[in-house]
């Protein structure tokens, strides 16, 4: 989404760090009151004089929303500006880093991005799924105003592919482990 929709300045600052794995990224769509109907989103983006926005709201089910595996976590957050149209047509996409970087990519100060909690899950425990709170966190528009879903779906389509690949990999590993166990098991075999 950043590569296809962000400004050149955002691309130059964020993509090298994200591509190298030095920083990681998330998608922030779902809110406590809206899952599939993102038109009900309440997260707000208030414009600042310098071209940035203050992002305020809560997002849930954020994969890898908080961790210490990278230097920074860059959140792509769907939010609504004050005069945006109602529903899905009023949603914009914003880049909101956990730690604000300097223009040269070195890290500056923490942004107002907080992890409210980490979900207790049955599976995929190595991936923290978080509730994220944005309290006037500084963010930048990615793509066009009120066209956030178009920009977000670039990333979502890639994520869907990788989730499918992950499922195939896990099922193949489970099958191979079960097959190995069944072949090596002594109990129940006839002499």
PLM features: residue spans?
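Internal maturation/activation junctions in enzymes
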Residues: 3-48
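Glycine- and acidic
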Residues: 1, 26-28, 56-62, 72, ...
């Amino acid at each position: 989404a950043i590569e296809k929709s962000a400004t050149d300045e955002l691309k130059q600052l964020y993509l090298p760090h994200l591509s190298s794995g030095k920083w990681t990224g998330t998608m922030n769509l779902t809110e406590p009151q809206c899952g599939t109907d993102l038109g009900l989103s309440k997260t707000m983006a208030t414009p600042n004089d310098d071209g940035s926005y203050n992002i305020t709201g809560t997002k849930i089910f954020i994969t890898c929303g908080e961790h210490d595996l990278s230097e920074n976590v860059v959140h792509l957050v769907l939010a609504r500006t004050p005069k945006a149209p109602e529903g899905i047509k009023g949603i914009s996409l914003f880049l909101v880093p956990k730690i604000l970087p300097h223009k040269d990519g070195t890290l500056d100060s923490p942004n107002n991005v907080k992890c409210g909690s980490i979900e207790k899950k049955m599976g995929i425990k190595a991936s923290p799924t978080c509730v994220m709170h944005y309290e006037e966190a500084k963010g930048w528009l990615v793509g066009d105003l009120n066209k956030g879903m178009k920009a977000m779906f670039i990333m979502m389509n890639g994520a869907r592919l990788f989730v499918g690949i992950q499922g195939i990999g896990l099922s193949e590993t489970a099958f191979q482990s079960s097959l190995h166990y069944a072949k090596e098991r002594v109990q129940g075999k006839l002499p």
